[in-house]
Amino acid sequence: MRALKVLALVFAPLVSLTVCGQNRADAAPATAGVAGAAYDTSAAANQRFLADYAARPDVKKLPDGLMYRVLRAAASDGPQVQKNSDTVWVYYKGTLINGKVFDKTKPEEPTSFQVGGVIPGWTEALKLMKTGDTWELVIPPDLAYASDGKGDAIPPNQSLVFLVSLTKVEYAP
């Protein structure tokens, strides 16, 4: 009987993590090799990274330079963002092209914000996603923080890689 209690204590959290993690950005398929040690944050490495990513057959490229891969498509035609004043709930992880994580949501809860209150690359991508989608975004500098960068976390003129899971859309009145 005691052994069963021990097994229950060991396996219950594992099952919980597996089930609860299904909507998290970290739970998306591995993206090893997308960003990492092969790239530094120099301008030349940034250009090489963008070219390498664009050459992948599963990447969708938009005219303004935003690129993405659909890692998990929504099971149905879920709600989509309609305007910049809509609020979304997402799980995400943002990295530089060298693989350094600069921001991410907490695993237990998504974050929410107005679609128009984020960098242009995010706004554009969110308007294309459906609730339930998980995408990998590659956002070029001019759709991110451009020559300004963002404090010590994001140097100027950096492309950014995001893993994004859209969990909810609330329409603005």
Where are these regions (language model features)?
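Cross-family detector of peptidyl-prolyl cis-trans isomerase
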Residues: 2-173
